[in-house]
């Protein structure tokens, strides 16, 4: 709790907790070191420290997942005073522990989609408005830094492995701490936010694509080739 007070005194005004689930059995399956009780305590400590802008994460479509589990996790986070919630489906990467040894009871794609739609419905019923595929907020508490990413705005990342986008160009630093500390790590250019990147990112947002903004940014009308690209993205999920 002392750390939370120090963060708040330093000017940090938003904090996020990776709750994921209100069931300890699921947290153990995920390899998370905390318990549901500790998650509740963290929210209470953050409020005592003066945080009013608190976010919580919910992981959907876990093994043997049910609507009841989602409801329990939402209750934990909402009662903790969260103003923002990120709710996202479990994604198993091929080289991860789950990729090598998939757990039993994973939902099918259709079952996972049903869970997601149920989560969206319940979150909005509880006053968390969806503004992006996986993000929901009370009015005025949307994640400002993420909106910058999705709008292809400028952002500066500091430190090893940090990514930045400035003046329409993307760059990042290698994940070599020693090289960074000794000022021998050169930033690596990684292209820019082109029309296709912009389309993909804008389609993550509930507001969708504004054709006038698109024309102002790229100096051209939205064309049939861009429409075909968007349709291809939709067909591929």
Language-model segments: which ranges?
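Mobile late-domain/C-terminal helix-loop "cap" segments
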Residues: 220-227
């Amino acid at each position: 709790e002392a750390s939370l007070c120090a963060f708040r005194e330093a000017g940090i005004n938003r904090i996020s907790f990776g709750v994921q689930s209100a069931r300890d059995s699921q947290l153990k399956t995920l390899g998370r070191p905390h318990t549901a009780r500790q998650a509740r305590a963290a929210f209470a400590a953050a409020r005592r420290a003066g945080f009013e802008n608190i976010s919580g994460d919910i992981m959907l479509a876990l093994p043997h997942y049910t609507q009841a589990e989602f409801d329990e996790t939402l209750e934990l986070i909402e009662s903790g005073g969260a103003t923002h919630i990120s709710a996202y489906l479990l994604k198993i990467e091929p080289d991860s522990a789950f990729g090598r040894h998939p757990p039993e009871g994973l939902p099918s794609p259709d079952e996972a989609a049903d869970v997601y739609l149920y989560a969206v419905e319940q979150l909005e019923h509880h006053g968390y408005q969806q503004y992006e595929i996986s993000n929901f907020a009370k009015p005025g508490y949307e994640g400002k830094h993420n909106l910058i990413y999705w709008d292809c705005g400028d952002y500066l990342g500091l430190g090893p492995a940090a990514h930045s986008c400035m003046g329409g160009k993307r760059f990042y630093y290698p994940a070599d701490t020693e090289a960074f500390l000794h000022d021998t790590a050169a930033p690596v250019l990684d292209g820019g936010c082109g029309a296709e990147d912009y389309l993909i990112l804008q389609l993550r947002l509930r507001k969708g694509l504004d054709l006038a903004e698109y024309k102002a940014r790229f100096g051209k009308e939205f064309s049939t080739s861009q429409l075909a690209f968007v349709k291809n993205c939709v067909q591929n999920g």
